[in-house]
Curated annotation (Swiss-Prot):
Mechanisms controlling activity: Adenine transport is strongly inhibited by decynium-22.
One cellular-component annotation, GO: basolateral plasma membrane
Glycosylation sites (chain numbering): N56, N220, N229
Superkingdom assignment: Eukaryota
Residue intervals passing through the bilayer: 17-37, 72-92, 102-122, 123-143, 156-176, 188-208, 279-299, 319-339, 356-376, 396-418, 427-447, 456-476
Phosphothreonine carried by residues: T258
Name assigned to this protein: Equilibrative nucleobase transporter 1
Subcellular location: Basolateral cell membrane
Modified residues (Phosphoserine): S253
Keyword RNA-binding found: no
Family, per entry: Belongs to the SLC43A transporter (TC 2.A.1.44) family.
Cited function: Sodium-independent purine-selective nucleobase transporter which mediates the equilibrative transport of extracellular purine nucleobases such as adenine, guanine and hypoxanthine. May regulate fatty acid (FA) transport in adipocytes, acting as a positive regulator of FA efflux and as a negative regulator of FA uptake.
Signal peptide: none
Amino acid sequence: MAGQGLPLHVATLLTGLLECLGFAGVLFGWPSLVFVFKNEDYFKDLCGPDAGPIGNATGQADCKAQDERFSLIFTLGSFMNNFMTFPTGYIFDRFKTTVARLIAIFFYTTATLIIAFTSAGSAVLLFLAMPMLTIGGILFLITNLQIGNLFGQHRSTIITLYNGAFDSSSAVFLIIKLLYEKGISLRASFIFISVCSTWHVARTFLLMPRGHIPYPLPPNYSYGLCPGNGTTKEEKETAEHENRELQSKEFLSAKEETPGAGQKQELRSFWSYAFSRRFAWHLVWLSVIQLWHYLFIGTLNSLLTNMAGGDMARVSTYTNAFAFTQFGVLCAPWNGLLMDRLKQKYQKEARKTGSSTLAVALCSTVPSLALTSLLCLGFALCASVPILPLQYLTFILQVISRSFLYGSNAAFLTLAFPSEHFGKLFGLVMALSAVVSLLQFPIFTLIKGSLQNDPFYVNVMFMLAILLTFFHPFLVYRECRTWKESPSAIA
């Protein structure tokens, strides 16, 4: 049966990778799309009378309001990308895969059609389209992350691979920009993306489960076109019960796996994890690093325009370079491989000591969390230096840092908390971090206004905040030390 199921699992994996790569995270290619919108005179009426023919080529200050409008659209889109993860996570947990994916397809298709038929006169519709596009994209990601459960001990690698593909999909807007420069209209590109929704529908019913993919994977598990494979309702309920028992045992140490200990485990509700110190510091870690990334992406067009002295040819070159570097799918799996390798190492140690598998999972996340903070610090340092050629290095550090950020986030929540709460905890941390991400617009306004386009003081504050994020892996490391000294102390 395993041999028969492997081709289906591989097909699900590869098509899910393509879906995340081509559709899920396109919002983060925003600078490329802004370049096209400016050439199409979107929000051109906000520019002063002395502005050049393509925005702020000759009068940078005159198009400040136009830049702010594009920044506001990105702020709203990125906010919805995170904030709506909580309700969409609930939808996924409550109504399962098929319903969640059909909702995603509806939002995504509607958004791409709106963008396809907008023009400079109806540019305000972007405020509706971009949030809808991101809601559909994040639902694609959430429903695909469970595919890692099909591959057992490689689960972290698959999760980080999908998050890397999510990041890399920002290159889609670069392709649209390049096609636009070759004469393919914006409308034609987005109509093509809309037509691709038929593929999403087919994949939903042929290569995805109606419900959830359980972990650990029960014997003879099947899904897709013939999900039941003759399995009766009673057998399914028995398999689900056994799966819940296996999941519970994952979060109990060898000494605690007694009939009485199961009763203690049931007392741990979703809110007990949501209000834990571990979750709180993870929220701080994610919010600070993510805010810096969002601010950088949302203001990149304006930043490059200032550094290039209004030379739009150079701005186009660096915008293309930024988009070309956005293939996080190439570096994200290294993060997952690191965690999987460390987890296997700590599992051997746990078998010798009879220690908790939760502690094993926690220990495997420490290097990844710390490395993500270090990469972001390097990225912030390079971005703070107003030398245009140095931004090539900034772009590389940015994509590696962002790939590690979202891969580490999803993997940490998967490994550090019970899987039955993953959808809700993932949604909650993204929703709360979305509230923090709203700060990007007032910060952008501050830079454009009081600081007179000089982001130096803002960059210094962000670097100090990024240093604070190192406290999260330090606390997780302390928990691991506590486990080694007293295995029953980890909960």
